[in-house]
């Protein structure tokens, strides 16, 4: 019985260390600030942007914690389950660029992504397990799509 308790204790410590190691490698953890907003490439130019939402979000802090994202709704996430993935341009913003291409074959998702600052074939994306995925332009810049607007977040 004593051996089982010791084994369980050591396994728990090992699991805790593994979680800490994963969290230490997660460069997205920490404080971010919503620094700007632009009309999303998929937005209908005839529709006006929701400036009230932009005013409510721009300048606000978003804090990525180990198991939670603190910040204004809908960016907050009480039970975050992070998964880092590499998306292609056609996959970011819930596949909006691919949908644009399906309607117009001349649309190039890579060029649209580049217009928002994304470079290369693999776009680091953090899936949160909540409504919003965060797409990273670089280590200090992330973008999210929300209600036909692309919001930029800068690491603090």
Residue ranges and their predicted role:
Residues 1-9:
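Bacterial N-terminal signal peptides that target proteins for export
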Residues 21-31:
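N-terminal helix-cap/turn-to-beta initiation motif at the start of protein domains
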Residues 34-72:
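Short, solvent-exposed loop/hinge segments that bridge or flank secondary-structure elements
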Residues 38-41, 64-132:
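Contiguous, well-ordered beta-strand patches that form the walls/edges
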Residues 61-68, 129, 133-142, 156:
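Short, solvent-exposed coil/turn segments at beta-strand boundaries
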Residues 76-91, 136-156:
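Edge beta-strand at a domain terminus
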């Amino acid at each position: 019985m004593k051996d089982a308790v010791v084994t369980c204790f050591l396994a728990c410590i090992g699991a805790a260390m593994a979680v800490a190691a994963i969290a230490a490698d997660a460069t997205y953890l920490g404080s971010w600030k919503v620094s700007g907003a632009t009309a999303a490439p998929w937005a209908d130019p005839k529709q006006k942007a929701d400036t009230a939402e932009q005013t409510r979000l721009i300048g606000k802090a978003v804090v990525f914690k180990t198991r939670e994202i603190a910040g204004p709704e809908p960016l907050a996430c009480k039970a975050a389950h992070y998964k880092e993935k590499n998306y292609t341009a056609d996959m970011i913003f819930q596949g909006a660029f691919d949908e644009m291409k399906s309607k117009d074959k001349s649309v190039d998702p890579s060029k649209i992504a580049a217009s928002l600052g994304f470079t290369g074939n693999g776009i680091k994306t953090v899936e949160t397990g909540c409504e919003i995925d965060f797409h990273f332009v670089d280590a200090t810049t992330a973008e999210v799509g929300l209600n036909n607007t692309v919001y930029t977040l800068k690491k603090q």
